[in-house]
Amino acid sequence: MADGCCPGNTTAIPAVPTITTYPVKGGFRHALCLPSSCHSRMWQLVTCQESCQPSIGAPSGCDPASCQPTRLPATSCVGFVCQPMCSHAACYQSGTGQSPCLVSSCQPSCSESTCCQEKCCDASPCQQSSCQESVCMSGSCQAACGQSVCCDAGSCQPSCSEVTSCPETSCLPTICTASPCQPTWCQGSSCQPVSGEGQPCKSTYYQPICYIFKPCQSALYMPVPCQPSTCVFSSCNTTCCVPSHCQPPHCQLVPSTCFIYQPVANCQAPCSTKNCCKPASCDTVISGQPTCDGPPSYNQSGCKSACCVTGLGTSPSSGSNCLPTSCQPSCESSFCKATLC
């Protein structure tokens, strides 16, 4: 296998079987495992068509002829090929004559242990790669946060026994760089925790190390706080989580499909429970005071009442002029103010 795995020089390996996993205590049994040639590298799973027939639109580096049918219990045919991501020139080394990888595809390589005191590329699916100075410790590079950036040869084995599921995010103000052995953590600058406590919240992005096909005929519920999920469908029965602002993720049944997490492009800010204001229910009258159906339906953050417009075009509460049409409150900071329609 050639070491040049950057875009434009991709190499595919023959398809290997996908095995349905069954959750047991402490992990998964019969996980999807990559062949030995996939070890110590970063890999990108390329799923083929359900019929596993060669297609004209096959991804770059996916040899249609190597896509062989693989039968899962009670499902249609599923096959895949391993396509390596950049696995060689992950570190910018001066004076070696080697051209560095493209910034957008650079990945730390477990076989590289000479990158100490050099700049290692931190590639993440959500943003442009950034290079950070590394500190040499026992032949491996350690990032400032303590996570390994460059591992010694043989220390990283991206097998399914190590990566069985995608972890949830944790709202901790920690920024860590990418590692071949662990998911990539990206900081969402506009992301706020749903609990409204104010600390910065990160979103999880998953490295294409080892994909797990969950059991068929079962519900898969994996909420990701502060980030909508992106579903990629395959061939099983499960549920797809559809998060919404200010609400926990809502799971919707998707017949005859199952999904695996893919990297999400951007971190979107969810609606914080501190400043989710709901409009009051007001009745427009021709004259006199406006009547409202019960107390204003605001949360506990002290949202002020909106402008209940009367037919005379005045607001009895504030005395300011209002248009004789319905006013909808808009949420600004932690209070609502009237908006003229």
From Swiss-Prot:
Domain of life: Eukaryota
Keywords per UniProt: Keratin, Repeat
Keyword Repeat part of the UniProt annotation: yes
Sequence repeat placement: 5-9, 115-119, 120-124, 150-154, 240-244, 276-280, 307-311
GO molecular function, one term: structural molecule activity
InterPro entries named among the record's database cross-references: KAP, Keratin_matx
Pfam families for this protein: Keratin_B2_2
Intrachain S-S bonds: none
One GO cellular component, as annotated: keratin filament
Keyword flag Repeat: yes
Region 7 X 5 AA repeats of C-C-X(3), residue ranges: 5-311
Bilayer-crossing regions: none
Similarity section: Belongs to the KRTAP type 10 family.
Protein name as annotated: Keratin-associated protein 29-1
Organismal lineage: Eukaryota, Metazoa, Chordata, Craniata, Vertebrata
Gene (name only): KRTAP29-1
